[in-house]
Amino acid sequence: MTAIDLLQPAEVFPTWPRAQRELDVFAREVPPAPHVLRTTGLLTPARAERITDWFLGADAAPDGDTRRAYRALARETAHVFAVATQCLGVRVRIAQEEPYESAAELCAELREHGTMTLVREATHPLLSPDELDRLRVVHDVFGHAALGLGFDLQSEYATWLQCRTLFSAQARPAAFCELVGAVTAYVGTGEKPGLRAKLPPAALL
């Protein structure tokens, strides 16, 4: 597994205070302080390895618990997406090719113009394309742009620790799979894994 060399997020740029304020209003619990998330490496190499092993482990057909978690995730994401589009005025475009060379470009566009562009992913086992798009918008707006953090692994984990507060206990395991499992496995192996729908053991949440 690729070592996690940095003890803090590597890509740090200006925050988006308006998005942070909306998150603070709609969060189900108090998130960690933005200063802590922006300056502290909270994902240990051992934990990253456990996440990767879990995500890439044997994959079974989604059971009832998994389906219920993903239904909750889709419902709650739709609500938070409405906060992004109605309260913050975020406008989303769909493109065929990746429009950004860096996280800094994405976050600057959101912060300065309230717009962002998505390239749709492959088919997901349980989420529709629109549901998956909404989750990515929520993650980018209330995670990356609000905190001013990039796509390195410590930054991704910090955005998770912020965004997890937007979801209920039922939806949170599914959100973890989508927002932590895939990117951690990608960084750990150097190969982009396929989309999966599975729930992590409680010790990883």
Regions found by a protein language model. Name each.
Residues 102, 151-152, 168-169:
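Intrinsic-disorder/low-complexity, polar/charged segments
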Residues 59-141:
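Long acidic/polar interaction regions in large eukaryotic complex-forming proteins
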Residues 43-51, 114-115, 119-126, 130, ...:
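Beta-strand-enriched cores of mature, soluble protein domains
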Residues 168-205:
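Polybasic, proline/glycine-rich intrinsically disordered low-complexity segments
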Residues 118-152, 159-165, 181-188:
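Amphipathic interfacial helices
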Residues 1-94:
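Sequence termini and other peripheral, non-core segments
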Residues 156-158, 176:
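Active-site/pore-lining binding-face segments in mid-to-C-terminal subdomains
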Residues 28, 82, 86, 111-112, ...:
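Generic surface-pattern signal
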